[in-house]
Each structure stands twice: as C-alpha cells, then as structure tokens.
C-alpha cells in the first residue's frame, strides 16, 4: 500500500473545479489499494461538500494546516485546539489594529469576525459572521485566519 498526499486549493482544485482527469487518477489510485490524503488549510465544513459534489472522497483529511485530522467520513481523529484565552486575545488584538475582519475555524465550521466597520475579507465562512461582542461565544478554536 502506498499513500499520496495532495494540497487542495490551486493543486487539485484549480479554478474552482477538480478536473475529470484528476478525479479519475485519484479513484484509480484508491481502487489499486492505495491511500489518498488531502492536506489543506481549510476546515472540513468548507471542503467536504466539494468532494461530495464530485462523488469521491480522500481516505484521510488533514485540515486547518494540521490542527485537525479526520477519517474519510469526517470523524475527527485528532484535534489541537488553540487555548480559548489565547485565541480570544489574538482576535481582540486584531480588532484593535483595525483588522479588516478575521476568520476563525472551529472544529465544525469557520466563522467570519466582522471588523468594526462591519466588513470581512474572509472567504468561505460556512458558519456565518459574528461581531466582536460575540467573541466570548466561541469555543473549540483550531485556527485563526487573517488576510
């Protein structure tokens, strides 16, 4: 058995699509008894639906730049959370320097933290948006995003 690991954005997923050629190569690789792994900065909620729309899935997901690992079905096998107070301190700091909106990946979704102007430069926030007043409600933080 062999294992192939691929990045997602701009590697397997180019111009917002997975080519038929790449999909077939992955499926043939897996049918030959090999493992296919995706390693990405994305969270499961923003990437798994894309694979579902193409009708295939990696054998393992390495997510949030390694902070989370899940099996083929999305069952979490490993998570390294950012201590809550540390994450909140970083997010408050970003707000204080007129950040244009940060993103926060939780174990189950990504939320966009709106700037004081009510804007966000973040993409793919499947968990919606929150304001600085709602920061205290965040838990299970695995990654902080800033553009």
Which residue stretches match the model-derived regions?
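Asp-based phosphoryl-transfer active-site loop
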Residues: 2-16, 90
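Short, flexible loop segments at the rims of nucleotide/cofactor-binding pockets, characterized by
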Residues: 13-16, 39, 122-123
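Short, acidic loop-to-helix structural element flanking the phosphoryl-transfer center
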Residues: 16-34, 79-88
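Substrate-recognition element of Asp-dependent hydrolases with the DxDx(T/V) motif
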Residues: 26-49, 65, 104-108, 143-147
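HAD-like small-molecule phosphatases
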Residues: 51, 67-147
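Short, structured coil segments at secondary-structure junctions
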Residues: 54-57, 65
């Amino acid at each position: 058995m062999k294992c192939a690991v691929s990045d997602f954005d701009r590697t397997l997923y180019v111009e917002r699509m997975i080519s038929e050629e790449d999909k077939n190569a992955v499926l043939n690789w897996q049918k030959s008894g090999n493992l296919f792994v995706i390693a990405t900065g994305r969270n499961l909620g923003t990437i798994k639906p894309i694979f579902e729309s193409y009708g295939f899935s990696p054998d393992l997901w390495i997510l949030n730049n390694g902070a989370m690992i899940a099996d083929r079905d999305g069952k979490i096998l490993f998570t390294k959370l950012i201590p809550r107070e540390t994450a909140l301190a970083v997010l408050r700091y970003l707000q204080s320097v007129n950040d244009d909106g940060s993103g926060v990946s939780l174990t189950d979704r990504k939320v966009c933290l709106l700037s004081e102007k009510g804007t966000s430069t973040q993409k793919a926030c499947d968990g919606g948006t929150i304001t600085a007043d709602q920061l205290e409600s965040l838990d299970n933080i695995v990654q902080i995003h800033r553009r």
